[in-house]
Amino acid sequence: MLTRLSNIADQINGPMIFITATSLVMLIGITAAMVYFTFRYHRRRNPHPEDIHGHRVLEIVWTVVPTILAFGFFWYGWQGYRYIKSPPPDALQIDVTGRMWSWNHTYANGVESPELYIPVNQAVKLNLHSQDVIHSYYIPAFKVKQDAVPNVPGLFLWFEAYQTGIYQVFCAEYCGMSHSAMWSKVHVVTADEFNTWLETEGAKVAQMKKAAESGDDGGNLHILGEALSKSKGCTACHSTDGSKLIGPSYKGIYGKTETVVTAGQERQVTVDDAYIKHSMLKPTDDIVKGYQPLMPSQEGLVSEAEIKALTAYIKSLQ
């Protein structure tokens, strides 16, 4: 509970220990006084108790002392709050987007990942966004948590991890049917390992864009699409093995005739490139029968190159 895996942990542990210790001392003192007074002023010892109409010193003491303690709690917490809300200007900036029901991490060079990769002993600032409802980005090991609210800019959290390893990320705000499955991981690695990972993933992004724009994918565009489906959180709702999740499975869907509900009317459509693209950009227009219209629009969130890569991946799952 008091592990020191990040700089923010110090700002949380200190006030918690102070408040807990103070409360414990007060609990013991008040309980001891109650027990003492119970015996000391028992009816058998004081058959005719004296009425006390006021005691100015006592009233001042039990007003002033708790007030000082309350201000002490506030001051201690305020110092930590100021620190938590003051990231260093050279912190590594990463955009984090929450959506039902996955996280996406976007780096400055365009790399996207469903899991967070950061270097050890370096300040990291996570700029939080939400595509749909309120989510909350929570890393228990580092004692950091911040809500991501739709259409509210400027939300962030920052920290500096002190130890390499893999840590859990959770959504700490109930966000619907698969809220409990909205978790991810933080990979804390050395600076060299982080730079290598970022360069490698950046090369994949450049390759995907080039292949999609030229139309010559060398047979590898579906591989890039597979990685993209994970980073975009597609696989949180669409399985690749035929099993039913929140949305239709990708397996065997390309070229299939599906029954969809359009403006309240059922009709037949063939799943092709145009249908897949339209379903990404305007997912509530044609709802596959038997499913709910839960998918948010990806318009402005996926590029033409990414749509082509995702389509190639879906095609490959026959």
Residue ranges and their predicted role:
Residues 1-25:
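Hydrophobic alpha-helical segments
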Residues 17-40, 54-137, 154-170:
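Beta-strand cores of secreted/periplasmic/IMS beta-sandwich domains, seen most often
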Residues 47-52:
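Membrane interface segments of multi-pass transport proteins and intramembrane proteases
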Residues 90, 148-214, 235:
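Extracellular/periplasmic metallocenter environments
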Residues 110-112, 195-230, 269-270:
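Electrostatic cytochrome c docking/interface patches
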Residues 117, 148, 160-161, 221, ...:
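Residue-level "contact hotspot" at macromolecular interaction interfaces
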Residues 160, 183-191, 226, 236-282, ...:
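Gly/Gly-Pro-rich "capping" loops immediately C-terminal to redox-active cysteine motifs
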Residues 195-201, 206, 293-318:
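C-terminal capping alpha-helices of c-type cytochrome domains
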